[in-house]
Amino acid sequence: YLYDPIMCCLCMEDLKDYENMRKAMIKHRSFPGFVEDITTFMANTLIGTSDAVIPAPEKRNLTKQFMNPSCCNITERLVYTDPYTDNDHNNKIFEPNRSFFEKELYGDERLHLEVAKLKEAFLSNGQSLIHGDLHTGSIMVKQGAMMVLDPEFACYAPAGYDVGNLIANLTFAWANAETTMQEGAEKAAFRGWLEETIEKSIDLFREKSLALL
């Protein structure tokens, strides 16, 4: 995006030759170059906006610029609160799964404690300028290229939030392939790509982050 407030002009790049990554993975399509691109994005964005790289005054200005109470409230509620409470207003449960939810999510006090720790960290640890919604539905891909969209949830929070969101979505894609694809070479190749991508997402992010310090 490019916005010129003087000319009242908004320019957007044409991405018609890209496709939504989540939809592409539902079709069991793989993107071998994706892990290099996404780890570069995460390292530059997360570490590049942290105290380890930028001066404190610059970080304070960015923190102020990206104060985002309304979207942060959505994250705090939909990620860290509602999934673990018996809230049928937001939790639309497939009835055969209800007993699982009641036992494993609503009734697990140890899980509630760990989630509360994560929520407290999200509220109080402004470590990096995160994307805030870095799932595969916010990524457009084609072979050899990637674009990250939907930055409206950006704020200062723990860097691990974005990394974990990405890993979780890749894991969901693996589970989808495991349960919906016929056994054979195509399934093995797609699962293998996902497993390699998950592993490299951590290793390359660490490597590229250290290179920025």
Language-model-derived ranges and their functions:
Residues 17, 146, 154-156:
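Activation segment
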Residues 160-213:
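Active-site activation/catalytic loop segments of kinase-like enzymes and analogous catalytic loops
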